[in-house]
């Protein structure tokens, strides 16, 4: 019996090869997208799962309650680690950890790499693969462990035990001996360092080399291991006794509560109700990056299943006699249903093979979209993935084949064999499915066009400071700043050179400021001479800082419009007195336009600019014209090598800080563009199949109409009338869905974006109609001009 089912299936494939090919290709594309979505989910869900002790590791985090908002912080006071070691008997291990970018020198080559400092028990707590050497090297202050990729890149070998590597701190070299080489961590790991040394080494680069571990002002990431989960509540309660020592040393930063966050959930909990400040680990994926691809894949799979169902019902008219005879010969309905579901399973299996082949191309393309993702296709090594494919096959075959199987086998053999029953083409169900197909296609097209327009909008949006033609580099001290500035002044393409301690786009700090009875957290940027001119920050009231003015350094500030608004200053803000750190009196001497320190992500925050002298400069800001940007950057890089040969050039474009927003826009355009094209093609092919089969059902009617004098235009209207109605309904449904869903997506990502407007909707709906007209145009026109004699003779 099974053999007969297979033979019948392949006979029907040959008879309807064009329509079957359309279905298999469409479903294959949908299956490939489902594979990518599953791998994306699996990659995220396995974040940090390779660490053996992950379930027993906790990070000490804290809450800060301020003005009704509970802020989260990932760091804990460094002395708390020693306190826990000495007094908390329920804690099995304690590890302090901190990480930052560092400069290194191997031979004559200077390079930058992420560097970590940790207590000696770090590798006892976390699972790393050792390639050579020993993890015990972390107990030795003179040794360093490096990643295998770093060893291969700069030593051209992994056999580097005993080799020397120099860390550069403020131009001073600190020598290390390589004591171990570890395999670089996967991208779904919290740790992203390429080198790690014993915790005590970090104090060698500070001015005060003795009090670092005992000063409650100093913060770091703090891990503890608790093997018995029942002890966690008691440990959390014990920790609250050490809130006071920290708060006594930080009047500007008072914590409310310590809490423990399980290591396995760190990545998932990064995106909570409030921003997790002070994160030193690799961020996890936002929920939208996990759920989004899955929803898109489901949309495409539904489109493919709709196509399959529509086509199956449409071509079923050719198989009525087969069904009638089989029922007359004793065939029961259950056998026929099983046969149709078997045919669906075989076609879906073919689509699964096509999807697996397409996934070989889609997975690398998806990896290229996101720098923090590396999906891999491993069928034999990943049992859960293999199970997913089987479940996907069964589910797809069931969804696509269940309705046609029950519908086609429901008719009585007498009606079929007497020729009283004829169906095919479209019915209410196929019309509904086609409507949803085009609605989903329109949704994807609207999203793609909206993100394209938004990319241009955000590219030109005024952030309150210059984004183009600005290069910012780090300097160690005033001597280095002066030497570098003097050398750069020789370049005629450089317009302005300014000094600063902070920078509006990526380096500032938050502290409470009080005006009369109102207190708010504000973003404070310490700037130097000519900073406003270099960054093109608009002064809308008052004056700029006076050069070398000790009074301005001590008590003058510039504030943003958002600052004035949030503090409720309704009259002239100039001269108003502010209170900072509970005792420092500051006076507003100028108001600048809003500065979007967080780019498009958040609403303009209240910003306060303070004036600092050259002794505090850590940044040099260079302004040039956009067309000279590359040439000036090259000049700065070469000049830096002469000024500070032991330090890596750190220059970066200010516009580069908008990279994340640009990447999201670009990738959203690519993803929704791909989905829109695929969805439109699926809908178009489904429409083509239904129109073709509908024409076959109406050949006699069309022939009679032409004999009776109907024009070609009238015939085209008869053929396409119901499909135009379907498109109109789909346009309304898809337009509404596209408008609201796209706006919700953008609103969840950005504060400043270009909403979907009527022009976008009009363009997309027009594009959908053009696709539909092109799809059915040739077929309907050819039918309208055919000789009626031929169709009537055949009928």
Tell me the role of every PLM-derived stretch:
Residues 36, 345-411, 453, 721-785:
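Small-residue-rich transmembrane alpha-helices
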Residues 6-22, 26, 306-347, 410-421, ...:
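Intracellular coupling helices
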Residues 119-132, 144-285, 486-661:
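Mid-to-C-terminal secondary-structure elements
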Residues 29-58, 363-371, 440-468, 745-750:
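Alpha-helical transmembrane segments
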Residues 2-6, 11, 15-16, 51, ...:
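Membrane-helix entry/capping segments
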Residues 13, 23, 44, 60, ...:
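Generic structural signal for small/hydrophobic residues in well-ordered secondary structure
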Residues 44, 55-112, 121, 152-157, ...:
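Hydrophobic, regular-secondary-structure patches
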Residues 15-42, 284-321, 348-349, 353, ...:
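Hydrophobic alpha-helical transmembrane segments of multi-pass inner-membrane transport and secretion
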């Amino acid at each position: 019996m099974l053999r007969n089912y297979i033979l019948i299936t392949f006979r029907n494939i040959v008879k309807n090869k064009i329509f079957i090919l359309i279905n298999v290709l469409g479903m294959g594309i949908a299956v490939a997208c489902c594979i990518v979505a599953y791998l994306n989910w699996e990659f995220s869900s396995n974040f940090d799962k390779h660490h053996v002790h992950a379930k027993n590791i906790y990070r000490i985090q804290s809450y800060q309650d301020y003005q009704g908002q509970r802020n989260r912080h990932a760091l804990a006071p460094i002395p708390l680690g020693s306190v826990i070691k000495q007094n908390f008997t329920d804690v099995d291990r304690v590890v302090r950890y901190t990480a930052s970018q560092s400069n290194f020198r191997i031979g004559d080559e200077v390079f930058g790499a992420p560097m970590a400092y940790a207590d000696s028990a770090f590798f006892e707590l976390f699972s790393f693969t050792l390639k050579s050497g020993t993890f015990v090297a972390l107990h030795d202050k003179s040794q360093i462990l490096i990643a295998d990729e770093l060893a291969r890149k700069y030593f051209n070998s992994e056999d580097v035990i005993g080799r020397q590597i120099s860390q550069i701190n403020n131009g001073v070299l600190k020598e290390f001996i390589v004591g171990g080489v570890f395999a670089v961590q996967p991208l779904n790991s919290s740790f992203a360092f390429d080198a790690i040394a014993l915790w005590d080494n970090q104090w060698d680069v500070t001015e005060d080399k003795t009090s670092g571990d005992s000063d409650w002002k100093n913060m770091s990431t703090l891990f503890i291991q608790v093997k018995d989960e029942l002890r966690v509540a008691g440990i959390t309660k014990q920790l609250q006794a050490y809130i006071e020592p920290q708060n006594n040393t930080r009047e500007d930063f008072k914590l409310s509560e310590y809490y423990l966050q399980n290591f396995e959930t760190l990545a998932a909990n990064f995106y909570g109700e409030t921003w997790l400040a002070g994160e030193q680990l690799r961020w996890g994926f936002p929920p939208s990056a996990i759920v989004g691809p899955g929803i898109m894949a489901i949309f495409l799979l539904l489109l493919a299943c709709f196509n399959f169902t529509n086509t199956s019902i449409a071509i079923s008219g050719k198989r009525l006699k087969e069904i009638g005879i089989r029922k007359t010969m004793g065939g029961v309905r259950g056998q026929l249903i099983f046969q149709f579901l078997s045919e669906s399973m075989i076609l879906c299996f073919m689509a699964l093979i096509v999807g697996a082949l397409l996934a070989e191309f889609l997975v690398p393309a998806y990896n290229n979209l996101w720098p923090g993702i590396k999906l891999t296709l491993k069928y034999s090594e990943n049992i859960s993935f293999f199970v997913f494919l089987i479940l996907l096959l069964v589910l797809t075959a069931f969804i696509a084949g269940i309705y046609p199987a029950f519908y086609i086998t429901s008719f009585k053999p007498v009606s079929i064999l007497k020729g009283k029953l004829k169906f095919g083409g479209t019915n209410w169900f196929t019309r509904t499915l086609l409507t949803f197909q085009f609605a989903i296609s329109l949704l994807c097209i609207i999203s793609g066009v909206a993100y394209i327009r938004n990319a241009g909008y955000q590219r030109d949006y005024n952030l309150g400071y210059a984004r183009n033609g600005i290069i910012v580099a780090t300097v160690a001290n005033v001597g280095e700043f002066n030497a570098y500035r003097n050398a750069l002044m020789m370049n005629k393409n450089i317009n302005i050179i300014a000094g600063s301690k902070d920078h509006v786009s990526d380096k500032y700090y938050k502290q409470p400021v009080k005006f009369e009875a109102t207190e708010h957290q504000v973003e404070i940027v310490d700037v130097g001479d000519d900073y406003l001119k270099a960054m093109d920050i608009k002064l809308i009231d008052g004056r700029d800082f006076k050069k070398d003015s000790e009074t301005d350094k001590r008590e003058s500030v510039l504030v943003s419009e958002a600052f004035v608004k949030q503090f409720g200053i309704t009259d002239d803000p100039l001269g108003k007195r502010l209170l900072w750190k509970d005792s420092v009196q500051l006076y507003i001497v100028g108001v600048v336009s809003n500065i979007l320190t967080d780019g498009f992500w958040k609403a303009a925050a209240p910003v306060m600019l303070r004036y600092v002298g050259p002794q505090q400069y850590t940044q040099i800001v260079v302004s040039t014209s956009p067309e000279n940007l590359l040439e000036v950057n090259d000049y700065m890089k070469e000049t830096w090598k002469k000024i500070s040969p032991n330090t890596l050039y750190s220059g970066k474009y200010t516009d580069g800080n908008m990279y994340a927003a640009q990447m999201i826009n670009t990738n959203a355009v690519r993803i929704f563009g791909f989905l829109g094209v695929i969805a439109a093609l699926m809908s178009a092919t489904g429409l083509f199949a239904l129109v073709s089969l509908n024409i076959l059902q109406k050949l006699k009617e069309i022939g009679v109409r032409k004999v009776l004098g109907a024009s070609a235009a009238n015939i085209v209207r008869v053929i396409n009338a119901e499909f135009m109605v379907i498109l109109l309904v789909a346009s309304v449904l898809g337009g509404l869905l596209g408008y609201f869903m796209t706006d919700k997506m953008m609103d969840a990502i950005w504060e400043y974006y270009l909403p979907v407007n009527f022009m976008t909707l009009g363009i997309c709906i027009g594009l959908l109609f053009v696709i539909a007209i092109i799809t059915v145009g040739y077929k309907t026109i050819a039918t309208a001009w055919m000789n009626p004699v031929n169709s009537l003779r055949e009928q």
